[in-house]
UniProtKB/Swiss-Prot annotation:
Biased composition regions of type Pro residues, renumbered to the chain: 1-18
Organism, scientific name: Mus musculus
Main localisation: nucleus
This protein's name: Forkhead box protein F2
Compartment(s) where it occurs, according to its Swiss-Prot or TrEMBL record: Nucleus
Record field: compositional bias (Basic residues): 263-274
Length: 446
């Protein structure tokens, strides 16, 4: 057979062995190596390495211990320093600064200057006085010196004196203004409001003038004092000679015939018109005394002669009872009787008519008062401020010489028919009714 004579078939190859890592030992070898004791050289090397590692560990631990000890020491030292600083702060906080004196710097400077016999000090001498007197200025705080300089230079109370030629040193003397010394009289160093000295200086002349001229029953104001009251106040009158000013007397009071400056006391009488007010019991106005003759002059609104009091007749308009009229008629004729008064609204609204006077004989006085009159106006152009004229009464037999009376202040009253007091060239007041006409009193219908 051909099959038996041919070459035999090759034998089958064995399967390839599984791949193994060269680095990883066999499991048996590893176990055997672990179970078998290591050789001596290996033990020596491992022991040396372990000892070196332990030595390194010991050195590192020692280093850490030393570092921790150093940190603890530094912390302790810092804590001790902090405690020491806290103790010093507490110790210094217990020493409080002395309290400031209860005076202003102006008062302190005035104290220093007044303590000097010459009443003047330099800036350094003021410093020395304050430091010697008050413990507050002896401390570490030095800002008070700036305050002293500020008050010296900016306050009106202190004057910087010029430096003397032969005086050594560089500082100027400071003294107190003589006009401000009254602010610190009797050791009073209290604080004053701003502008106190200027107000006091402005009020000083007026105060002395009023104090020297005030009085009751005598001259109220000095000769040169120019008194002009506002519309709501009674009008003042100038005076000269024996009068000198206003007379503040109740109505009906007779100042007496023996006033100084009267040549013929038996010819002069002084009466006063009561206040025009709705109630008869109201107060009276101040008035100006005017000398009189026997017959009398109707120089005021509705003023009658011979002691008779009269006003508008019953046919005229009612008399207003406004209190503003009270301040208008003040410098008046003395011939109006003290018993004359303005009627109240409840009573008859008209004034009494004199029996001897008729509306035809005295048309100016019989005209009614304007009911809407509320105030008066003082015409400055008619005021005789410089010329002191004597009132010559009417006819020659009534004239008297050198009688000091009120200045002729001219009142423009808001009346319809009542005469307004305007001056004329004659300068004389004539009897208002009967045989003569009044040349100085002209009707002024407003």
């Amino acid at each position: 057979m051909s099959t038996e004579g041919g070459p035999p078939p090759p034998p089958p190859r064995p399967p390839p062995a599984p791949l193994r890592r060269a680095c990883s030992p066999a499991p048996g070898a590893l176990q055997a190596a672990l179970m078998s004791p290591p050789p001596a050289a290996t033990l020596e090397s491992t022991s040396s390495s372990s000892s070196s590692s332990s030595a390194s560990c010991a050195s590192s631990s020692s280093n850490s211990v030393s570092a921790s000890a150093g940190a603890c020491k530094s912390a302790a030292s810092s804590g001790g320093a902090g405690a020491g600083s806290g103790g010093t702060k507490k110790a210094t906080s217990g020493l409080r600064r002395p309290e400031k004196p209860p005076y202003s710097y102006i008062a302190l400077i005035v104290m220093a200057i007044q303590s000097s016999p010459s009443k003047r000090l330099t800036l350094s001498e003021i410093y020395q006085f304050l430091q010697a007197r008050f413990p507050f200025f002896r401390g570490a705080y030095q800002g008070w010196k700036n305050s002293v300089r500020h008050n010296l230079s900016l306050n009106e109370c202190f004057i910087k004196l010029p430096k003397g030629l032969g005086r050594p040193g560089k500082g100027h003397y400071w003294t107190i203004d003589p006009a401000s010394e009254f602010m610190f009289e009797e050791g009073s160093f209290r604080r004053r409001p701003r502008g106190f000295r200027r107000k006091c200086q402005a009020l000083k002349p007026m105060y002395h003038r009023v104090v020297s001229g005030l009085g009751f029953g005598a001259s109220l104001l000095p000769q040169g004092f120019d008194f002009q009251a506002p519309p709501s106040a009674p009008l003042g009158c100038h005076g000269q000679g024996g009068y000198g000013g206003l007379d503040m007397m109740p109505a009906g009071y007779d100042t007496g015939a023996g006033a100084p400056g009267h040549a013929h006391p038996h010819h002069l009488h002084h009466h006063h018109v009561p206040h025009m007010s709705p109630n008869p019991g109201s107060t009276y106005m101040a008035s100006c005394p005017v000398p009189a003759g026997p017959a009398g002059v109707g120089a005021a609104a509705g003023g009658g002669g011979g002691g008779g009091d009269y006003g508008p007749d019953s046919s005229s308009s009612p008399v207003p009872s406004s209190p503003a009229m009270a301040s208008a008629i003040e410098c008046h004729s003395p011939y109006t009787s003290p018993a004359a008064h303005w009627s109240s609204p409840g009573a008859s609204p008209y004034l009494k008519q004199p029996p001897a006077l008729t509306p035809s004989s005295n048309p100016a006085a019989s005209a009614g008062l304007h009911p809407s009159m509320s105030s008066y106006s003082l015409e400055q152009s008619y005021l005789h401020q410089n010329a002191r004229e004597d009132l010559s009464v009417g006819l020659p037999r009534y004239q008297h010489h050198s009688t000091p009376v009120c200045d002729r202040k001219d009142f423009v009253l808001n009346f319809n028919g009542i005469s307004s007091f305007h001056p004329s060239a004659s300068g004389s007041y004539y009897h208002h009714h009967h045989q003569s006409v009044c040349q100085d009193i002209k009707p002024c219908v407003m």
